[in-house]
Each structure stands twice: as C-alpha cells, then as structure tokens.
Amino acid sequence: MAKFEIKEEFYLDGKPFKILSGAIQYFRLHPDQWRDTLYNLKALGFNTVETYIPWALHEPQEGQFQAEGMLDFEAYFKLVEEMGLYLIVRPTPYICAEFDFGGLPAWLLR
C-alpha cells in the first residue's frame, strides 16, 4: 500500500506529490459512461477524481439502501483504481446547494 504524508507539501512513497483533481460524480452518469469520462480526465493530466456520496440517493427511505446501477459506488471506485487514478471520497452528510436539504434524506426530518 502506498504511504501518503503531509509535511511542507504532500508526499507519496517519499516523493513530492501534487494532487490534480477533477470532480466526476458517479451518480450523475450512466455506468456505461464512467470509463470514457475517467479516461478523458486522465488524458487531461489529472491524477485524482473526487466524488460525493449522496446519502439521500443511497437511502431514500430509512433502512432501504440502494447501490446498483448509477449508485454502484463500489464498481466506480474499482474502475477508478483500475484506471490508475487516485480517489477523494466525500462521504459528508452535506453536499452544498447541489441537492435539496444538502443531500441528506428527507426522512431525517420525521
């Protein structure tokens, strides 16, 4: 496993490392588009992809989890690794203004 350190700059396995990241949200693309989209990101010189985990989509009803098709983040993460990219996962419960209620599921209000 690679060793990542933060000193005066980032280091990966003892060498200075710059994170060049672009955001590609797996849940906004059909899985058939993931590979080409990630390929294009890498072709532009990026080495990292960033994505949210939208709780409201993965658990729309309390206790009912969804992780198939466009929501199959495990398959997306494996593809990112297969393509030689690094991944920044943002499993935050709040996704700014991009989703109603910040991406939190509405059932939390009950």
Residue ranges and their predicted role:
Residues W34-L109:
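Aromatic-lined substrate-binding rim segments of carbohydrate-active enzymes
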